[in-house]
């Protein structure tokens, strides 16, 4: 039984409230877009924003005649320089919002593990889409998005390279297939779904209930949360990722909510086909949970 003397204060915040956002920033120009999205969401949901700077390990700065210590000193100095340059650039991009962001650096940990340690205290984490040049020019290390999405256990919002607006979540599209991953993603997205102007759900094959013996479907489930959903049924497809992007474009969606599918191995994480396709070809932000 709870001891009333140790219980926290009661609040009127809903159980699905969004109060803490962690965003990954690095030395790439796309970091500003991620931060602006995070700040816009924070303003709408009265949340705090923490920006965690982390890049792939610096390229080997040693050369013939360099000692290991000198090379390490050079790499540390380069990292510090990149951090200060990135922070100055991002603060200029944020303008009046800059004082509201708490800034951190990954120290003494790999970027992935350092970020995962901070992510456990976030209601939402914000990452950037990775490209073929991943890890170069001050970006995140290879496999960073997969690591956070599959092992972080938090709703993960991935922002595409090119984004026309920082107002994300006005028109939301849910990719629904009745899986545990899709259900966790919908639960993680509830604060955004509550605040959205429109919510759509797309299914492939059977329709919104998916499970043949289910007494509920996604419309009824979200109606119980006070969220109205328009459903769309598509024919079964071998290219669900591409089809999902096409549906999002046709509806004018600015956010896709979907499960993150894949499995981890000892040294790598293998994404499912639809998840991999979306992360490569995404044109709007995607919120996912493994």
Regions found by a protein language model. Give the residues of each.
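A short acidic, glycine-rich active-site loop
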Residues: 71-85
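Structural beta-alpha unit
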Residues: 1-13, 92-125, 132, 225-256, ...
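Small/aliphatic-rich secondary-structure junction motif
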Residues: 2-71, 151, 164, 168-234
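Redox-cofactor binding/interface segments in oxidoreductases and associated redox assembly factors
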Residues: 23, 127-128, 174, 258
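Short beta-strand elements of ligand-binding domains
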Residues: 127-129, 155-162, 287-290
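Structural alpha-helical scaffold elements that stabilize or flank donor/cofactor-binding regions
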Residues: 14, 117-118, 148, 192, ...
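Glycine-rich, Arg-bearing micro-motifs that act as flexible, cationic patches
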Residues: 127-147, 169, 259-280
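P-loop/Walker A phosphate-binding loop and immediately adjacent motor/lid segment at beta-alpha junctions
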Residues: 88, 94-96, 135-160, 222-231
């Amino acid at each position: 039984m709870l001891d009333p003397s140790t219980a926290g204060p009661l609040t009127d915040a809903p159980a699905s409230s969004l109060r803490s956002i962690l965003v990954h920033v690095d030395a790439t120009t796309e970091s500003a877009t991620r931060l602006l999205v995070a700040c816009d969401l924070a303003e709408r949901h009265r949340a705090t924003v923490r920006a965690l700077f982390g890049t792939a390990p610096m390229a080997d700065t040693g050369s013939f005649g360099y000692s290991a210590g000198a090379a390490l000193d050079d790499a540390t100095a380069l990292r510090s320089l990149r951090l200060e340059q990135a922070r100055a650039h991002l603060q200029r991009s944020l303008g009046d919002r800059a004082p509201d962001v708490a800034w951190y650096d990954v120290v003494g940990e790999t970027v992935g593990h350092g970020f995962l340690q901070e992510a456990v205290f976030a209601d939402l984490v914000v990452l950037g889409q990775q490209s073929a040049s991943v890890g170069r020019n001050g970006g995140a290390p290879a496999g960073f998005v997969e690591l956070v999405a599959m092992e972080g256990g938090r709703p993960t919002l991935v922002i595409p390279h090119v984004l026309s607006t920082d107002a994300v979540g006005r028109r939301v599209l849910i990719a629904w297939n009745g899986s545990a991953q899709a259900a966790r993603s919908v639960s993680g997205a509830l604060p955004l779904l509550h605040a959205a102007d429109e919510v759509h759900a797309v299914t492939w094959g059977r329709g919104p209930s998916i499970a043949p013996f289910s007494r509920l479907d996604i419309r009824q489930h979200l109606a119980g949360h006070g969220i109205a959903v328009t459903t769309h049924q598509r024919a079964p497809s071998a290219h669900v990722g591409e089809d999902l992007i096409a549906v999002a474009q046709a509806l004018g969606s600015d956010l896709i909510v979907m499960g993150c599918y894949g499995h981890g191995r000892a040294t790598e994480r293998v994404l499912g086909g639809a998840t991999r396709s979306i992360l490569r070809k995404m044109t709007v932000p995607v919120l996912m949970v493994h």
